[in-house]
Amino acid sequence: TFTDLEKLGVNMTAVVPVGLTKYRQGLYPLTEYNQETAAQTLDLIEKFGDECVKKYGRRIFYAGDEFYIKAHRPIPDPDFYEGFPAVEDGIGMIACLKEEIEFAVEDSDYNDALNYKVTMACGEAVAPYLRDMMKIIATKFPNIEINVVAIKNNFFGGGVNVSGLVTGGDLIDQLKDKDLGDKLFIPSSMLRFENDIFLDDVSVEDVERELNISLGIVNNNGDELVREVTTVKE
């Protein structure tokens, strides 16, 4: 398949692992990737990508971030992604966000006067990486406590662990009566295009009411994330 696509002259191919929910009764049997099979697939994708770099000067074949997470492999550096041509498809999203946060923090003045706590909810897959990114923000804003909470996807179940499929109901169930601080942030990918309804038809207002907290919706942009987190109380 890789060779066939290469012959067609495609500009870029993104390869992502299948995500299986608990709602698969009567459907074609599919096997979810584990650490071993994810690593094998990743080796194959990177092999073809490296060959394309030698032939054409560009990678063409990219693996989704989830393959690196499942294979327990480090996320490649930003240069690997050649300008992030498929970041919206989950290709290099973690590396891109981290780089943007680093640039935004580098341009920020040191400020230890801001003193408050916020919570950032996300899917289980990205939580460890997001926690590391929040440490970068802490280098310039040491008294802002940013608590990253991984939300288990009980609604879809199975191996679904990405932020974009977290539902409002799961947010409410898992964050109820928790100390969330002064604001709760979520990525905009959790919401439908109107940016006010989750996939389970729970609204932003429902979550704010049930958790008694203001909800901040942040796009997958490091500069915006740093700005939002550091301006809760100015």
What are the roles of these predicted feature ranges?
Residues 3-14, 19-234:
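Auxiliary Fe-S-binding modules of radical SAM enzymes
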